Amino acid sequence: MLPRTASATRTPHLNRLVSAGSRRVLPRCSSSLGIRGSLAATPRLLSTITTQQPSPLKRQPAPRATVGFERHLATVLDEPAQTATTPLYELRSFSPQAPLTVRDHTKVYAKQRVNYHGIPGDVNEMFLVFEACLQVGRLERAAQVLKRLANLDVVPPADYLDLFNQYLDAKVSQLLQEPDVDKADDIHKAFETMVSDGRELPVGGETVALLLKASLTSTDPETMQRYVTRYLSLLPTQIALETVFNTEILTYEELTKVAELCPKYNMPDNVDPDTFAQQQQQQQQQQQQQQEQQQQQDTSIDQSEVSIEPLLTSSEPSAIPEVLGTPQKGFGLQFVKRTVSMFKDIPDGFDISTLPMSQQREIQSKLEKDCVDASLARWREENESLQKMGLNTSLDTPSLNSRLYQWQKDLETRLRTMLVEVEKSEMVSKKNKDDLDRCIYGPFIRQSNPERLAAVTIISTLSSLAMGGAHKGSTIASLITHIAKFAEEDIRVQKAEALISKRNLRKAKSKQHNPRSVLRFKNSTASAGSSDMADSNNVAVEMDDEAWTTTIRTKVGAALLSALLDTAKITLVREDPVTKTLITQNQPAFSHVMQLRKGKKIGTIIPNKAVVELLVREPVPDFLARHLPMVTPPDPWVSFEKGAYLETKTPVLRLKNGEREQRLYTEAAIARGDMDQVFKGLDVLGKTGWKINSPVFKVMLDVWNSGKQVANIPPLDPIFDLPPEPASTEDPTVKRAWLKEIKVIENERSGLHSQRCFMNFQLEIARAYRDQTFYFPHNVDFRGRAYPIPPYLNHMGADHVRGLMLFAKGKPLGESGLRWLKVHLANVYGFDKASLQERQDFADENIENIRDSVNNPLNGNQWWLQAEDPWQCLATCFELAAALELEDPTKYVSHLPIHQDGTCNGLQHYAALGGDTWGAQQVNLVPGDRPADVYSAVAKLVIKGIEDDLAKDNEFAKAMHGKITRKVVKQTVMTNVYGVTYVGARKQVLKQIEAAYPNITAESGIEAALLASYVTQHIFRAMSTMFKGAHDIQNWLGEIGGRVCRALTPEQLDEFERSERSPHGDGTASGENITLAGNPRKSSAHKNDEILNNFQSTIIWTTPLRMPVVQPYRKHGTKTVSTCMQDLVMTIPERSDPVNRRKQLQAFPPNFIHSLDASHMILSALHCDELGLTFAAVHDSFWTHASDIDSMNAVLRDAFIRIHSEDVIGRLAAEFQARYKNSLYLAKIETGTKVAQEIQRWRVRNKLGPRKELLLEKERQELLRSSNPEDVERGKKMISPASLYELYSSAEDLTVPEDLKEVTIGNLAGVEETKVRRGREMDEEGEVDGSEEAVEHEDGMHEDEMLADEPRDMDGNSGLDELSELRNTNHFALSQKRAKASIASGGKQKHYLDIWLPLVFPPIPEKGDFDVRSLKDSTYFFS
């Protein structure tokens, strides 16, 4: 029975709450149908319902910004408000005792099978299919989804009603477009069916208004009267007046008709109908005048755009030569050229920034939207040009580009056939497997048109193959994901454009029919405020479409790829070896094969050899157009996906697939204003204008077109001396060695070619932008580090790209600027460890070399090529020479960015945190006459250690004596602070030793790898000595991080208790079919680990800028997805996935430091902007004009001091204590202790098991926290393992500390057993290294090296003993020896006991005596 809403006897306040509560505010997405022009996205994202309606005068955040947002304790909202005069660059106060906490209330529903109608069983996928069906007008399919949701009874009533309203909205819109009695009857039947299913649904004004609109289409007056009366009776008069009549659904004429049919809803007696009609007519005239004015403005804009056409058409050819294409002529390079083709029509010297802003934005929008359209137009034009020349494009031609048009047309035809098949599959009563697949992916491919889908499929397929190596092919799983992502992105762009047009039309219509400004109703006692409240209740809050699920992406991508494989053909022309005639043969362009990889059969797409040859010559850029530099300042960041590019939605946070938790925290922080400083900082970085350095570009272009190798530009045709192939009669090992050498050469050749291809793109973009002012929009990673979004050309690029960059805005040098310009020259040359005066003198002493480099860069003495950064050196030479040409060089207007680099910035932060005076001196935190060099200091300590070993006649010391230089230790010292492990450090040292001493193995008789291990031990020991305070902090960070990763929060404990008391009683959800990666643990000894696998917590903290950081490392589950090509096992990332404890622990200290240096950079950017400085940054390298360097350096020091003047570590400890308050963690204690023996006796007596022990401890802690003294007393009397631990270990902490070998500075580790131990722990963790994307750090290290596992510790001489043993024993004998030793020591192995304890953290390490305020006078902090 349908419940009636509360009676009209309620107070106005209660009525407003009823009105607000009758309909939840849900996310919105665009719709091609619908009265309101927007559809609610899905209720799966809704986690909280606001009990107080927001003010209609304030712009409300998108619902996802408040998903799961809860305030615990006192939040920032309770703190004193920041005054309006507080500068942005000042740190905002926040209470670490009240951290932002997000609870994701998204329910995990039991997954069902796809039903016989082809409706998926996953609730999230049902929502997506429902939205897609409404979008493409397949309302009968949408009705089937609604029916299944109702049958499963998994959606709350209010959310289900909102879904029904969306369906009703679309049905009514369809009825109005095509009036039909049957369609109207379907609407009424659908409502009655919903009412009669027994669910109590809170029907509100929106539902009634839609039903009334459908009723008014009836041609029978009696039927119309009956329906209108019936639907209005569902709501009391007062509620109907405030909701139904205040929606935007019913027009004035329809409201008048309803009032005629039901007189009690008529206008008040004191309103004259003639006066009312006259007012409406006047209002419509005003709206019409406004529309005409708007049209005139639009016309004037169009005319102004036409008027600039002559400016954009040059009659003379450009003076800048074309960029010589690396034998890739055609597809890849031509695509770049086509993408930036609009610049080719602009005469030299014309800057788009001189146009009005509206025209600049129009050009930028065109640039962003030009990707697929440019490809289609280019393919079509080339095909037509070949046809005009009488060439057959199906025959063997030298360019893949000539075939793409035919591929596109054939694929377009196949997709049209596919859509017909989808429609048939939806209609057939008995569906087979293919029909069910089509029913799922059909609504999604219908959202685009076949022409665009075909182009997107071809572009994404070729780009994926080209990026991964065409000759190797690509796995089906990665390829279909790549295709589906780009198809999804393209569909979103099309929907966004349609939504903008629909909004404009809707606004025009609503302004013509808006009687609510003068309309008042009889019996309405609500105040104006309540009327506004009712209006605000009906505002559709729009948000971004929810991303497709992995299953939907897989099915869509597989369907598109399968269609491409069926249609893409390549025609080969070959000569018959016998008859010498030409034979034409059609072959598939791609093949689907199964390959063995690591013992598993993997579906792979292999291109035809002819296609591979073309792809090698013609690499394909990856949707380049949407990620070019902007020609207008980026839009300011205002929400998670609103900012930067004008047309392309880009998230402010760089996320991997499925990282939902970081997004939830970020959106919650945005909602309460915590991201304001980060947003403003990104805006500052983005608004910095750039231009191309023309003199350097011309030199670079000459080098490029010559095909020679100069600086870091590889040669066009590299020459390698190939070793002669050994005779077939020789030893097979010789042949294997020859093949290995050939492979190395081919890999190097391929690497140089790839490098040149990428540079080709960069130079083509630089040529297109050579006269333009352009901008790099920025976003951040999960730690808060800022990165430019355009990936191909930006100031974070290699030396040749940085050499091309100039600030668009120039500033006179002045005395200070001239001095810093000279210092910068010395820095980029490599003379950067001298004093500032010595660096200035270096430039003065090389004036002739500088002038020669400028006047004759390629044929002179080429002094600039000897620099550490030659292209940046050349750019500085041009700038300095131009200044010196003036009578007064200080008056020269300089555009060159001057860099100020930190001295191992991570160690600077660690030294400040730990208070290490010695360490602070080595990283220039302490004032000095000359710059300190931490790398040289570490090298000296290593040399001293080797000399000590030499005195003991150590053979390794003899081999390395006199061979330790600054360069050998530099990379290891630099990366140590960022989590480099022993394995990664050893690789770094080995690379340096082999480069400097290639014959060291032959000379010393010791393998270079063993010598690298020896040196690495000394480096790590030196680091731990120099940075003792930092070492202690890393230990502390690792310990608290490890405890958090083994903890259960109160919410998780409650969930665990509910699952234990459920009928299943196994702690898992019924019907769950996702399995965790790794080996399941079935032994009873691992019950606690099973609990943790389901409920582990990730490490979360807040940066000084109040940005929440959520570490993303989890062990994702897998799911088998059936597609039209093959069954695929796909990774399914979920927020509920257990964390990868090993990576969480290892990554915490370096990520924490990264979050500090990111905060330092943003604060510096904000302060520089306040002072009017131009600012750019490359992590810990900050750039500005030469004349502003002194000001920027003062800002950098001030920001660092402000960050570290606060108790950063103390605040982190307080935040963790608050964030993980009342949690329990799984601790380990040694079995030989007294407390362990008592616990074992208790367990023997009680026999509870791990699960019940956990529940027992949960109950005990709740009683102890109770405000009831009796409960507290009961808790004190309870006996549990934790209470026994508290009783017997009150004097000291007996828990086993975390294994921190992977975490701390100066970590020493052994050499062998790495792979064995690593493999064993990987099995235990259930993690496969290859499953994570490799994240390259600025030092060139990859994440797998930074987070590699560690072998066992080695202290003192034990490391040398083992190295000697390794040298003198073969691998097999060593393995046998260690296996026996392991068995022999089995009885002595330590055993541990697991117990659940309240989560507490160890005390903060004592800080050293370094005072960070002394930094204020340090000249070389950044220099």
Curated annotation (Swiss-Prot):
<feature type="active site">
    <location>
        <position position="970"/>
    </location>
</feature>
<comment type="similarity">
    <text>Belongs to the phage and mitochondrial RNA polymerase family.</text>
</comment>
<dbReference type="Pfam" id="PF00940">
    <property type="entry name" value="RNA_pol"/>
</dbReference>
<feature type="compositionally biased region" description="Basic and acidic residues">
    <location>
        <begin position="1055"/>
        <end position="1064"/>
    </location>
</feature>
<dbReference type="InterPro" id="IPR037159">
    <property type="entry name" value="RNA_POL_N_sf"/>
</dbReference>
<dbReference type="InterPro" id="IPR043502">
    <property type="entry name" value="DNA/RNA_pol_sf"/>
</dbReference>
<feature type="region of interest" description="Disordered">
    <location>
        <begin position="1055"/>
        <end position="1087"/>
    </location>
</feature>
<keyword id="KW-0496">Mitochondrion</keyword>
<dbReference type="GO" id="GO:0006390">
    <property type="term" value="P:mitochondrial transcription"/>
</dbReference>
<keyword id="KW-0240">DNA-directed RNA polymerase</keyword>
<comment type="function">
    <text>DNA-dependent RNA polymerase catalyzes the transcription of DNA into RNA using the four ribonucleoside triphosphates as substrates.</text>
</comment>
<feature type="compositionally biased region" description="Low complexity">
    <location>
        <begin position="278"/>
        <end position="297"/>
    </location>
</feature>
<dbReference type="InterPro" id="IPR024075">
    <property type="entry name" value="DNA-dir_RNA_pol_helix_hairp_sf"/>
</dbReference>
<dbReference type="GO" id="GO:0001018">
    <property type="term" value="F:mitochondrial promoter sequence-specific DNA binding"/>
</dbReference>
<dbReference type="GO" id="GO:0003899">
    <property type="term" value="F:DNA-directed RNA polymerase activity"/>
</dbReference>
<feature type="active site">
    <location>
        <position position="1180"/>
    </location>
</feature>
<dbReference type="InterPro" id="IPR046950">
    <property type="entry name" value="DNA-dir_Rpol_C_phage-type"/>
</dbReference>
<keyword id="KW-0804">Transcription</keyword>
<protein>
    <recommendedName>
        <fullName>DNA-directed RNA polymerase, mitochondrial</fullName>
        <ecNumber>2.7.7.6</ecNumber>
    </recommendedName>
</protein>
<keyword id="KW-0808">Transferase</keyword>
<keyword id="KW-0809">Transit peptide</keyword>
<feature type="compositionally biased region" description="Acidic residues">
    <location>
        <begin position="1322"/>
        <end position="1336"/>
    </location>
</feature>
<feature type="region of interest" description="Disordered">
    <location>
        <begin position="1316"/>
        <end position="1342"/>
    </location>
</feature>
<dbReference type="Pfam" id="PF14700">
    <property type="entry name" value="RPOL_N"/>
</dbReference>
<dbReference type="GO" id="GO:0034245">
    <property type="term" value="C:mitochondrial DNA-directed RNA polymerase complex"/>
</dbReference>
<keyword id="KW-0548">Nucleotidyltransferase</keyword>
<feature type="region of interest" description="Disordered">
    <location>
        <begin position="266"/>
        <end position="303"/>
    </location>
</feature>
<feature type="transit peptide" description="Mitochondrion">
    <location>
        <begin position="1"/>
        <end position="73"/>
    </location>
</feature>
<feature type="active site">
    <location>
        <position position="901"/>
    </location>
</feature>
<dbReference type="InterPro" id="IPR002092">
    <property type="entry name" value="DNA-dir_Rpol_phage-type"/>
</dbReference>
<dbReference type="InterPro" id="IPR029262">
    <property type="entry name" value="RPOL_N"/>
</dbReference>
